Amino acid sequence: MIRVVQFLNQIQAGLGGDERMDIESRPEQGAVGMGMLLRTMLMRKGADIVGTVICGDHYFLENREEAVAKLTELIRPFRADVVICGPALNHKRFGECCGYLAEALENREKIPAFAAMAKESTGTELFRNRVYIIETPKVGGTGLNASLKRIADFAVKKSKGEPIGSSEEEGYFKRD
């Protein structure tokens, strides 16, 4: 089984909205919140969300290096084959958090990781040339199931170290 860890913010984890943006990094066993939908698609491909790491947007961005270090520390015990950062949809601050964490995991820790967010997220332009970002709809937009399927497919491919196809084939934002 492919071991997946997902990174979510307080909203996607179901812990509250903007009033909970100060939540510090914490782990959860298995899938939570938005991850419950994604887990179904991953399981069809021989993968499962073994853990979720959560951090509030405000806390992450105000303490970026500390948050990245703590989240990395929390991810290690799950022995992840791949880390999915998001989906952030069009939550601007969360998109940036996803980009920073995916970049650190890939470059510093050599853990396969990628992000998922809508084109409207500020994280998309900041990170599209630095990490793979699977395109998702914005909140309330159509196509969430299709994007979750692309996320699951990409996670499996990334975990196996398989060659990554074009942005059109894989569903990530084109890199310059």
Describe the predicted segments one by one:
Residues 1-176:
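An N-terminal assembly and electron-transfer interface module characteristic of large anaerobic redox
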